[in-house]
Amino acid sequence: MSILFSSILFSIATFFSRILGLFRDVLFAKYFGVSYELDAYFIAIMFPFFLRKVFGEGAMSSAFVPLYSEKSGEEKDKFLSSVINGFSLIILALVILSYFFPELIINLFGAGSSHETKILAKKLLLITSPSIYFIFLWAISYSILNTNNKFFWPALTPSISNITIIIGTFLSTKYGIISPTIGFLIGSILMFFSIIKSIIKHKYYFTIKHFPHFLKLFFPTFMTMVVSQINTVVDMNVVSFYDKGSISYLQYASRFYLLPYGLFAVSVSTVVLSKISNDRKNFNYHLNDALKTTLFFTIPSMVGLIFLSTPIIRFFYEHGAFTSKDTLITSKILIAYTLGLPFYGIYSTISRSYHAIKNTKTPFIAATIVSLSNIILDIIFGLKYGPIGVALATSIAGIIGVLYLLFSVKTFPIKDFLKISLNSLIMLFVIYLTDFTDNEFWFLIQILIGILVYLIFSSIFYRDLIRRFLYARKK
């Protein structure tokens, strides 16, 4: 099964989860708008969510998949037990830390927040902290399934968390922000139990024999992801010193930016990690294939989101407590974020490819460059322009990081990039021609027209990618 076809299966599952996530945020906008309660919620879930990003989409899979795929029989079971036993102790310490020193974590993600926001966030953090352990177990199960080239169901499991949070949000009219917070915890538990079979089929050993060896590969990838996620910490802290609700603005806008990123960039990078881990001799072939696929989806997504940002935000969010002013601010933030979409797609693909061949140094240097650039640019743009400046800083930092990675890997499908860019510009021109009404539903028609035009011209100028997809599907 090709990278393209595997990525599309992954994307279908991710799309369902992201749509539920979008519906969840629509409900947030309706019930909470841009408020200190929602800011407190985002701060409280950021610690477990931060670890989920590190474990689920980064260090855990990047270190676990190559080592796990090398082992067989009893050694595979002992390796899995070692990782679970070793990390259980570490995560227990993190949970205890969050219970006894919640102020440290609150200040880590929202130092500039108001007193009432911090007080509420502290209460909510006590609810979300236990989810860390279940997120870790989910990440292990997720990695095992990916190693066996099973991508669809693992990618679908985050939908469970979105569903429980949605239920909690509906109950918020009676219980307030507490109910979606409890929904977050329940969702984390159910996510693990939905794929627990991949772990329990292995024989358990009371050992940490392989854990030190695993840490040698995990620690550099972990530090790479931590450095990458520092951007999120810095972003939230900078906007927390801005107007009340700025954290909420940032989260609302990032939802639409992360939709195509999760659908395409994360999907491709997850698949290419497994492909290269099992076929390292063809590193360049798999990397180029992955880059083409990433560009094929992220460039038109960027173009469409930039042009249609305002009608998209208005349609989904401008209800209840969310005002037209909020729409204008959020759409500008979305544009600033979206400028970096293709670059973060390339960044993710190349970084995971390096991890597959156990090269952790290059991704770490790239992550450090991105993080330092983001911190400097946050200070320059964020403190002056608030969440819009923070989003722009994120995009520019991603571009800088990609330039370093491209210089390092010395390969890039430039001809494919030009073809895809041309097709995307043609798509944009057609969307522009159809922009003749203020009907709030019309942008949906424009999206469908844009997709159709893009696919038609891609079939003319980019036949090889379409042909490879059809061939992979037949296989």
Curated annotation (Swiss-Prot):
Record-linked InterPro entries: Lipid_II_flippase_MurJ/MviN, MurJ
Effect seen on changing residue 259 to W: Loss of activity
Keyword Transmembrane: yes
Protein's UniProt name: Lipid II flippase MurJ
Protein's job: Involved in peptidoglycan biosynthesis. Transports lipid-linked peptidoglycan precursors from the inner to the outer leaflet of the cytoplasmic membrane.
Membrane topology (Cytoplasmic): 1-2, 57-78, 145-150, 197-213, 272-287, 354-362, 408-416, 462-475
Taxonomic lineage: Bacteria, Thermotogati, Thermotogota, Thermotogae, Thermotogales
Pfam families in the cross-refs: MurJ
Organism: Thermosipho africanus (strain TCF52B)
Topology in the lipid bilayer: Multi-pass membrane protein
